[in-house]
């Protein structure tokens, strides 16, 4: 599901786009088809996709939900990052300094 969320957030999958069939995706991801079936059902319950009998499964997500998913994913990544950095002994002020240095280096790189 996270793979589909990321693709939707990045704009790689848009409303109306057909996603692979459950069987196709199971083969591509090399996972059990039952796992994919459960994931597709969950995405339908979350109103991320819609399955049209005989036609396939299509992205059907509104912009508000997309923004909410993006924020939740960013928060999850940030929580993981902070937790790992704290485990390494870094303080919040260290993280801010490191992030500022990183962003300055990226800006200089882009110029």
Predicted regions and their residues:
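Short, cationic-aromatic polyanion-contact patches
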Residues: 21, 55-72
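Beta-hairpin "wing" of winged helix-turn-helix
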Residues: 12-13, 17, 45-54, 58-61
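Residue cluster at the C-terminal edge of the helix-turn-helix DNA-binding motif
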Residues: 28, 45-48, 88, 105
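A short alpha-helical element within helix-turn-helix/winged-helix DNA-binding domains
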Residues: 18-29, 43
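Extreme N-terminal segment that seeds HTH/winged-HTH DNA-binding domains in transcriptional regulators
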Residues: 1-18, 24, 72, 76, ...
């Amino acid at each position: 599901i996270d793979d589909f969320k990321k693709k939707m957030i990045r704009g790689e999958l848009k409303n109306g786009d057909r996603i692979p069939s459950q069987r196709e995706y199971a083969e591509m991801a090399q996972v059990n088809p039952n796992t994919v079936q459960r994931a597709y059902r969950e995405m339908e319950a979350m109103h991320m996709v819609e399955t049209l009998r005989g036609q396939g499964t299509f992205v059907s997500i509104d912009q508000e939900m997309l923004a909410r998913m993006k924020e939740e994913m960013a928060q999850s990544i940030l929580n993981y990052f902070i937790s790992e950095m704290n485990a390494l002994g870094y303080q919040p002020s260290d993280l801010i300094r490191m992030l500022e240095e990183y962003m300055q280096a990226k800006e200089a790189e882009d110029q």
